[in-house]
Amino acid sequence: MKLPYLPPALFISLVLQAGPVRAATAEYEIEIRDHLFYPSELTIPSGVKVKLRVINTDETAEEFESFELNREKVIRGGKTGIVFIGPLKAGEYPFFGEFYPKTAQGKIIVVDDN
């Protein structure tokens, strides 16, 4: 089978329009309210990159921190921070608020989606 001739400019424009294929990023939200995380447990599927939107409704700053996730993010009062995590293996990944560690605690629960 013979392919039709495409002028180089047309060929290049078609290739550039196609662009790279990217996997969708799952999005979840956690709210900081009264120095607590809501929800305190968040279940996500394994093997997926996650965009975690952390909304701090308190007037004071808080830091989303997790040693297991290797993440730290200070979120000023009344602001929203974005934390990317994953892809992760099944398991539990605790996180806490560094400024109020006795109350601001939670965990990401990663489950196999099979």
Regions found by a protein language model. Name each.
Residues 1-5:
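Positively charged n-region of N-terminal signal peptides that target proteins for export
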Residues 24-29, 36, 76-114:
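Extracellular/periplasmic metallocenter environments
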Residues 57-77, 106:
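Histidine- and aromatic-enriched segments that form or immediately flank copper-ligand environments
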Residues 7-17:
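Bacterial N-terminal signal peptides
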Residues 19-23:
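Sec/Tat signal peptide C-region and signal peptidase I cleavage site
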Residues 44, 64, 112-114:
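Extracytoplasmic/periplasmic soluble domains downstream of a signal peptide or transmembrane helix
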Residues 31-35, 47, 55, 67-69, ...:
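Generic beta-structure capping elements
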